């Protein structure tokens, strides 16, 4: 049996005393609860559930409790959703500065969120740089749009929760314990301190673990070394906790998964692998196919995308004989056109049938071609578009005839939840055309992260922050060169640098990044029995050095 990923001795007293434990993410909270269950299972038949919550979960609970209290200050108000938020920022920018691209909506939103989380106000910024002048205009319009629609931001809800604790509408906690936080915004600190007079940080028990440093030729060699090391470890003992940390895991997920899979097969190791980073829902096979089918109805698409749809198992064309598909592909290529419309595609594939008419299997395709209206002229609500999209997908045979595997079934369920979220945008009170509807649907599917449900696994692939607080028998942390660890500063271009440094805002002070890096490093050391740090000596034509924080650790060579 695998050991738990959490040292439960750190939490036993707090859980027995029914204290509130807060973590920065759901994963850490779930692992603490799981470890408590394993601990209790050996001696008890039943036990009480520990009060362990991720910070987001706890704040959501507090907000819902506040709404149940019918508090006058928030009566009739709701927290703006992520897609609503994007829409209001885009609208604020277009109304004030139509020549400015809507791509600035995200950075404007992130900047305003940081200002609020740091318990500051835009009015406090005195400098009048061109970027700041624009930003202040956008914020003014954004706040007006929220007020008009009785919406507030998440940090606004924090302020309301603080007031509830300060006015005794909420009872204070005797003690709040936090675990796994690397930094806490000032407004969140204020909220926790209002919720309890005693806020304590739980630290891992100090260990004498001495990390070793491995130098690799390049990033690919570094990943392969880590993967082979993990495979060898699991072959010698499959019942141990092994972790590989890849700082940019979310951006290199498929590559890392492929290299790890190759290493396990090379060493003849059959082992489950748990990956902390998810995939944008839009990039999963089933949902990408659905989006492609919806888009093809009213948008000319490149030949390559039509071929992807034609050979996909996720629509009615999967039942068309292969030779007919080959003939259709040749027919499309003979037109020498780069793009084809839905009608043009239907014409070619139906004409390839030996009788000269569409076979029964393609009748829905013909009906859709002949009967569907011009989407570009339709104006509907979001929920009406959701119904239309679902109808079109059903007509086009999505998600296919064959039985879905577990992964595909999870993707299908996530897609249905996404359409429900899309329908809830009706509260914007607008009707939109096909192009706008598809844009919002794509945004939602890109923002939604798909995490496959998998069984517990001995090998964990994690990002830097996801690994923090978890316990491992052996841990390998990659990407530890001097340019990457500590992280470099990144000044927000919309705010004056001096203002950011004065208030110690995110990513503006090298000493703050150094402090976070040291805290992470100490956590890895205290939560691992065996620890390796690696870095690439070259990246392209660039020569890299190990992080200065590793200078006192011995160097070793690891055999592949």
Identify the function of each model-found stretch.
Residues 1-560:
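Polyanion-engaging groove/track-forming segments
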């Amino acid at each position: 049996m695998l050991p738990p990923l959490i040292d439960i001795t750190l939490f036993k007293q707090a859980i027995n005393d029914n204290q509130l434990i807060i973590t920065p993410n759901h994963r850490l909270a779930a692992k603490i609860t799981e470890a408590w269950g394993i601990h209790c299972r050996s001696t008890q038949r039943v036990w009480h559930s520990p009060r362990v919550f991720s910070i987001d979960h706890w704040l959501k609970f507090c907000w819902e409790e506040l709404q149940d209290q019918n508090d006058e200050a928030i009566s009739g108000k709701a927290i703006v959703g992520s897609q609503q938020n994007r829409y209001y920022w885009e609208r604020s920018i277009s109304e004030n500065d139509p020549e400015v691209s809507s791509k600035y909506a995200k950075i404007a939103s992130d900047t305003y969120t940081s200002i609020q989380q740091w318990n500051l106000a835009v009015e406090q910024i005195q400098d009048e740089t061109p970027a700041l002048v624009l930003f202040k205009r956008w914020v003014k319009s954004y706040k007006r749009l929220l007020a008009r629609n009785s919406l507030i931001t998440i940090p606004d809800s924090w302020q309301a929760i603080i007031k509830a604790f300060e006015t005794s509408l909420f009872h204070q906690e005797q003690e709040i314990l936090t675990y796994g936080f690397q930094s806490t915004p000032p407004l969140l600190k204020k909220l926790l301190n209002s919720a309890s007079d005693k806020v304590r940080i739980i630290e891992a028990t100090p260990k004498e673990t001495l990390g070793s440093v491995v130098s690799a030729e390049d990033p690919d060699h570094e990943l392969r070394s880590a993967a082979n090391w993990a495979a060898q470890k699991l072959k010698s003992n499959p019942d141990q906790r092994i972790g590989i940390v890849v700082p940019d895991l979310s951006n290199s997920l498929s590559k890392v998964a492929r290299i790890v899979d190759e290493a396990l097969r090379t060493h003849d190791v059959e082992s489950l692998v748990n990956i902390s980073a998810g995939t944008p829902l839009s990039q999963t096979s089933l949902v990408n196919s659905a989006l492609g089918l919806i888009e093809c109805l009213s948008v000319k698409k490149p030949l390559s995308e039509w071929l992807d749809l034609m050979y996909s198992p996720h629509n009615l064309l999967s039942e068309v004989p292969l030779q007919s598909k080959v003939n259709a592909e040749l027919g499309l290529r003979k037109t020498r056109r780069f793009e084809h419309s839905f009608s043009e595609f239907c014409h070619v594939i139906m004409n390839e049938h030996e009788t000269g008419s569409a076979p029964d299997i393609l009748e829905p395709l013909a009906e859709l071609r002949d009967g569907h209206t011009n989407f570009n002229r339709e104006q509907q609500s979001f929920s009406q578009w959701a119904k239309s999209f679902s109808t079109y997908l059903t007509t086009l045979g999505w998600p296919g005839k064959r039985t879905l595997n577990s992964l595909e079934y999870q993707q299908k369920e996530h897609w249905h939840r996404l359409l429900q979220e899309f329908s809830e945008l009706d509260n914007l009170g607008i009707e939109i055309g096909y192009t706008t509807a598809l844009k919002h649907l794509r945004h939602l599917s890109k923002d939604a992260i798909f995490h496959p449900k998998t069984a517990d696994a001995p090998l964990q692939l994690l990002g830097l922050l996801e690994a923090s607080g978890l316990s491992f028998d052996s841990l390998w942390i990659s990407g530890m060169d001097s340019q990457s660890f500590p992280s470099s500063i990144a000044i927000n271009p919309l705010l004056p640098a001096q203002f950011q440094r004065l208030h110690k805002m995110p990513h503006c002070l090298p000493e703050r990044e150094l402090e976070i890096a040291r805290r992470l490093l100490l956590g890895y050391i205290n939560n691992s029995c065996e620890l390796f740090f690696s870095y690439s000596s070259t990246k392209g034509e660039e020569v890299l050095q190990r992080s200065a924080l590793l200078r006192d650790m011995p160097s070793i060579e690891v055999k592949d």
